[in-house]
């Protein structure tokens, strides 16, 4: 096995080389991931119309809340795994993997159930109107329905990256983004499913990506993998994950609050189309922000 795929280098390799080795694939993956929103908006805007774009923009704060809980577990779990691998503690890394999976399952289910139960009030709070609520609801019902898949896929991919496979984690994102774009074209234009088609495409793409990541952790040659006895939640591990992941969690929540304030002001002074325009601009800005986020993930 080559050194570049050997997590033992986390404790021996030059820091600069490690930063490049982990950051470049992470940057490419994060930039590719930002294309999710851009591709969806391109297809939805052309096939459905501007109000659908506004409805999609309304969903951003709710998706950001979900992402906040995902980063709480993902950032904390992947960091702890990297530490354990540097210490050559494979069993400890495996326990963190199992605990991270269980936390993502639990949090993903809570967000899915609570989001679906109170979806309309939440969307109205985030700036939806009678003109846009249908589009936002149609999209989020499907996205929330697949929320557990999203959480587990992203969490496991982060751990795969930090456990010595940054390129493989990058390929996972590429698979999801490319498949999402292809399915968008089929579901939106050929089948005429509109904004629901975009949501279905996203969940299917993430399901395929989850299968890809799961295959990695079932491989006996992987340094950490699915094993018996790793899925029991341990207070020490959960506390460690939450303490490290709290910073990105708070950042995501703050970002959510900012978008809600923007949506409220834009609805008051510009109307539904102004919210849609902000959503488009925000997607483009996030494309460049992801470069910095990719660098931090590589760290």
Spans of features found by a protein language model:
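Short runs within selected transmembrane alpha-helices of multi-pass transporters and secretion channels
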Residues: 74, 143-161, 169-180, 198-213, ...
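Short alpha-helical transmembrane segments in multi-pass integral membrane proteins
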Residues: 1-23, 81-148, 190-245
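Generic alpha-helical transmembrane segments of integral inner-membrane proteins
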Residues: 27-31, 35, 39, 69, ...
């Amino acid at each position: 096995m080559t050194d570049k795929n050997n997590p033992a280098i986390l404790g021996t390799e030059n820091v600069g080389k490690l930063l490049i080795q982990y950051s470049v694939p992470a940057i490419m993956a994060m930039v590719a991931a930002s294309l999710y929103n851009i591709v969806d908006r391109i297809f939805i805007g052309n096939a459905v119309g501007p109000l659908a774009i506004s409805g999609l923009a309304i969903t951003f704060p709710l998706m950001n809340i979900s992402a906040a809980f995902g980063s709480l577990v993902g950032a904390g779990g992947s960091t702890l795994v990297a530490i354990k691998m540097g210490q050559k503690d494979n069993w400890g890394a495996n326990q963190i993997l199992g605990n991270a999976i269980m936390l993502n399952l639990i949090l993903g289910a809570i967000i899915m159930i609570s989001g679906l139960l109170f979806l309309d009030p939440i969307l109205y709070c985030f700036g939806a109107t009678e003109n846009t609520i249908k589009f936002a609801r149609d999209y989020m019902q499907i996205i929330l329905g697949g929320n557990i898949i999203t959480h587990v896929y992203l969490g496991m991919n982060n751990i795969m990256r930090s456990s010595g496979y940054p390129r493989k984690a990058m390929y996972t994102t590429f698979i999801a983004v490319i498949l999402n774009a292809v399915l968008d074209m089929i579901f939106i234009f050929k089948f005429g499913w509109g904004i629901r088609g975009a949501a279905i495409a996203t969940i299917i793409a993430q399901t395929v990506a989850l299968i890809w990541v799961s295959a990695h952790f079932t491989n006996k040659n992987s340094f950490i993998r699915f094993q018996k006895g790793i899925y029991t939640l341990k207070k020490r591990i959960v506390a460690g994950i939450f303490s490290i992941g709290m910073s990105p969690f708070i950042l995501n929540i703050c970002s959510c609050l900012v978008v809600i304030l923007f949506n409220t002001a834009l609805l008051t002074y510009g109307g539904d189309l102004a919210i849609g325009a902000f959503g488009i601009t925000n997607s483009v800005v996030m494309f460049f922000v992801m470069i910095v986020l990719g660098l931090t993930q590589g760290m």
